[in-house]
């Protein structure tokens, strides 16, 4: 099998025209004949490039408002024809070999994301000729190069220059993989969209099925292989969504340290998503996917110092997230005080990076600032299936809370209640969080009974010498019995925030009244499993 194939004729037909003129100029300068369609052909001609319209090449005009352009034997024969095997039949029918196909597809995702997009709009943005050419070229990668990503343009020209106008089989095969990934993702988007429209289409509902089509097709891109998974006997890799719109661990840049582990990524995600809840300078320290210390402060140094005091023992080897730039003073405090696996922040100063560089094992990630949180889906794998739900972006403000006890909370209790409610959302259920003066003072996570989570939170506070008296307590779900309130009162809690909704709410409220505790209902639960 010949490893190299010269590129003498290329067909270019793209929706995303970024870089296409420069790429076409580079091809033409190297003697490549250019074929093109529609808007791409007009653009290239306007730039003075010698380009042949596909309709002139085939002798068949574009028709049906552009629905039929490239679906012709002279196009697909030129792409699919096997060099050295189909030459005679190609010559008989005046089919010229096409050595490169440059295609990206109609912007279906952008179309359906637009407010007010109708099914008819979506249908008109389903590309037919494009995917057909992509698949034809990818199938015949032995002889044809298929280019679907503008990010490959420069590398292709460099390789052609290094190989006297040819591309290697290895490159053509790699391009074919990208092509099939491209069409698979495209078809998945269409299938998901159509699947979500089934009830409305059949008149069963006035609304579409929403985010949950009857068949779910997912496309993720491998970002990196991991040394191992959650445990050393498990293999693992990290896959990310394409075109992620929110600052996240998936989009973060590692600026220092050794490769991230599977557990590093999971814990960093937990820390970053928690710290995003706060507008003030905040710090979140996570261990085994649970916050072990959270605080807001006048600066990130102040926030870190307060978060660390919650549970210094658990903070050892933890993940630290900030919602402001990592500065030198804070970096020095962390490095001097504890062993840390990962620090993530929107940015890091040069001075801070010089300080953390002294500890080679410390991984530093920057993720950029985040704006409004982006709705999406969460997944949980079960044996033989996948649970899918909307991302939990729910949160309540002070105006939405219901005071259900005789005593009203003080202003400070209310602030602390809202603070620890945000933290409880990210603690594994059953979750109890004690907070005072905008810092956690005790966290009880992952217990099978809520009362034991409450007791653990109190024990944590006592172990660190943190005063619970006058603190607020958050519970991620309702109290099924009064025992959790009794445990909180014994520890010194004076305000409780919880969803409510238990059949024993009256009993729980009565317990709070007995202890002089103010209780707030959110009417929103935050289970986390």
Swiss-Prot record:
> PROSITE patterns recorded for this chain?
MGS
Please state the span of the N-terminal signal peptide per the UniProt entry: none
| A single GO cellular-component term on record | cytosol
Give the Enzyme Commission number. 2.1.2.3, 3.5.4.10
For this protein, the record's SMART domains field holds: AICARFT_IMPCHas, MGS
An annotated GO BP: 'de novo' IMP biosynthetic process
What reaction gets catalysed by this protein?
(6R)-10-formyltetrahydrofolate + 5-amino-1-(5-phospho-beta-D-ribosyl)imidazole-4-carboxamide = 5-formamido-1-(5-phospho-D-ribosyl)imidazole-4-carboxamide + (6S)-5,6,7,8-tetrahydrofolate; IMP + H2O = 5-formamido-1-(5-phospho-D-ribosyl)imidazole-4-carboxamide
Q: In which pathway does it act?
A: Purine metabolism; IMP biosynthesis via de novo pathway; 5-formamido-1-(5-phospho-D-ribosyl)imidazole-4-carboxamide from 5-amino-1-(5-phospho-D-ribosyl)imidazole-4-carboxamide (10-formyl THF route): step 1/1; Purine metabolism; IMP biosynthesis via de novo pathway; IMP from 5-formamido-1-(5-phospho-D-ribosyl)imidazole-4-carboxamide: step 1/1
Q: Which UniProt keywords apply?
A: Acetylation, Hydrolase, Multifunctional enzyme, Purine biosynthesis, Transferase
Name the chain's protein: Bifunctional purine biosynthesis protein PurH
